[in-house]
Amino acid sequence: FSQMNDGWFVTAMPDLNQKNPHVYRYLVQNSFWWIEYADIDGIRMDTYPYADYDAMSNWMKELNEEYPNYNTVGETWVTEPAYTAWWQKDSKLSAPKNSNLKTVMDFSFYDKINIAKTEETETWFKGLDRVYNSFVYDFLYPNPESVLAFIENHDTDRFLGEGDNLPMLKQASTLLLTTRRIP
C-alpha cells in the first residue's frame, strides 16, 4: 500500500510528494492556471486512488470551491460498484472522510458489458443481466448521474477488437447513451 501512495505506482511513474506543502500548492495553482489559460472544462485524473488521499481530497475541495461548475473525473479502476462508490464525493461508504471527487469511472459497467457481448442472456447472471446487476448497486453512489460510463478507453482493448460486429457495437452504444451515467 505505501508503495502505491508514497513512491511509485509503477517503476515508470514516480509520484510527486503531495504531502510537501510547496508541491501541493504548486499542483493546485497549476490546475487553476490550466483552467483559466486553456479554458478546459474538466480534468481526468489518472490512477486517482493511488495518490495521497488527503491531498487529493483537499485539491478537489479547492477546485470545487473556486470552480463549482467544473468537473474532475477520477480513474478508479475497480470493477465492483461498492469500491467505486467509496471514492465519489459525499459517499456514506467513506465517511467520515470525503474525497470531494464528483465523478468516478464506472469500470463495473465496462467490465460487465465487455463480458456480456460474448454471452446470450438466457440464464441469470449472463449477458446483459450482468450489466443490470451492476446497476442495482446505484443506491451506493451519492450521485449516480455523475458516474462516467464507457465501453472502452485508452487503457483497454477496443470494444470490437475481436471482430467487426456492428450490431453489437450499436447495442452497446445505445445502452451507454441511454443509461443513467455520463457517457
Protein language model regions, located:
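Aromatic- and acidic-residue-enriched carbohydrate-binding clefts of CAZyme catalytic domains
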Residues: 1-17
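Alpha-helical scaffold elements lining the catalytic groove of polysaccharide deacetylases
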Residues: 18-30
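Active-site-proximal helices and loops of the catalytic beta/alpha 8
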Residues: 30-32, 36-143, 147, 164-166, ...
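Ligand-binding/active-site lining segments
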Residues: 150
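Surface-exposed cleft-lining segments at the edges of enzyme active sites
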Residues: 157-161
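Short helix/strand-capping turn motifs
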Residues: 182-183
